[in-house]
């Protein structure tokens, strides 16, 4: 299901029957309708970014709900797909903060230790937040708790009210939180633009001796 270290740690936090319930849920929703991302990409964030290499967490809400967009990494779409509005604003802020990045696929961030996690890992076609509140919150809360228990600093990037509520789970003082309004067109002008999350994260990582992320890669 996930990278083995993630699996071993997460299962210590979750109820014993949780994975069985998740598999039953996935069997049902993928059999009865169109669901994104493709089933083999549901846990992609944890497969691409191992626990021991995670330096930054960027928490999204749920996957894109249009065809060919969602790929299992929050905010990321394939380069062949136009950037959705939130990703457009993320790239605009990145350009103002550090420099221009032309790729829409954020896999290279994930490969550098940026965990691109959605709070809800699946979505029905055309129904934003259609699976919210059903099965996923205990899982993604468990991921945050596992990171919180680490003895090496992690930078938690929380965009928007939903993500910012997860700050309550980050109780270990060695970690760092960068928060702002969501990059959605509805809220980006209320403080996301100008928040410089990328250079701020790199400054923290550099200070902690963890090495910077190449956000333009």
Curated annotation (Swiss-Prot):
CDD domains: UDG-F1-like. The active site is at 62 (proton acceptor). GO terms for cellular component: cytoplasm. Keywords: Cytoplasm, DNA damage, DNA repair, Hydrolase. Its main location: cytoplasm. One of its GO terms (biological process) is base-excision repair, AP site formation via deaminated base removal. The keyword Hydrolase applies. It is found in: Cytoplasm. The keyword DNA damage applies. It catalyses: Hydrolyzes single-stranded DNA or mismatched double-stranded DNA and polynucleotides, releasing free uracil. GO terms for molecular function: uracil DNA N-glycosylase activity. Its EC number is 3.2.2.27. InterPro entries: UDG_fam1, Ura-DNA_Glyclase_AS, Uracil-DNA_glycosylase-like, Uracil-DNA_glycosylase-like_sf. It is an enzyme of class 3 (hydrolase). It comes from the Bacteria. Belongs to the uracil-DNA glycosylase (UDG) superfamily. UNG family. HAMAP family: UDG. Excises uracil residues from the DNA which can arise as a result of misincorporation of dUMP residues by DNA polymerase or due to deamination of cytosine. NCBIfam families: PRK05254.1-1, PRK05254.1-2, PRK05254.1-4, PRK05254.1-5, ung. This is Uracil-DNA glycosylase. It comes from Streptococcus equi subsp. zooepidemicus (strain H70). The gene is ung.
């Amino acid at each position: 299901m996930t990278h083995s270290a993630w699996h071993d740690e997460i299962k210590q936090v979750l109820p014993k029957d949780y994975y069985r319930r998740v598999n039953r849920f996935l069997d049902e929703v993928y059999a009865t309708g169109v669901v994104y991302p493709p089933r083999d990409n549901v846990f992609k964030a944890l497969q691409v970014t191992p626990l021991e290499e995670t330096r930054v967490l960027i928490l999204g809400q749920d996957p894109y709900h249009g065809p060919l967009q969602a790929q299992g990494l929050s905010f990321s779409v394939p380069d062949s797909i136009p950037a959705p509005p939130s990703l457009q604003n993320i790239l605009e802020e990145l350009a103002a903060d550090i420099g221009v990045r032309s790729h829409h696929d954020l896999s290279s961030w994930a490969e550098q230790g940026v965990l691109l996690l959605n709070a809800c890992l699946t979505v029905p076609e055309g129904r934003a937040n259609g699976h919210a509140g059903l099965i996923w919150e205990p899982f993604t809360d468990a991921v945050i708790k596992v990171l919180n228990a680490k003895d090496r600093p992690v930078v938690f990037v929380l965009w928007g009210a939903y993500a910012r509520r997860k700050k309550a789970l980050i109780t270990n003082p060695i970690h760092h939180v960068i928060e702002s309004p969501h990059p959605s067109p509805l809220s980006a002008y209320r403080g996301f633009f100008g928040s410089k999350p990328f250079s701020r994260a790199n400054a923290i990582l550099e200070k902690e001796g963890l090495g910077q992320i190449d956000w333009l890669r």
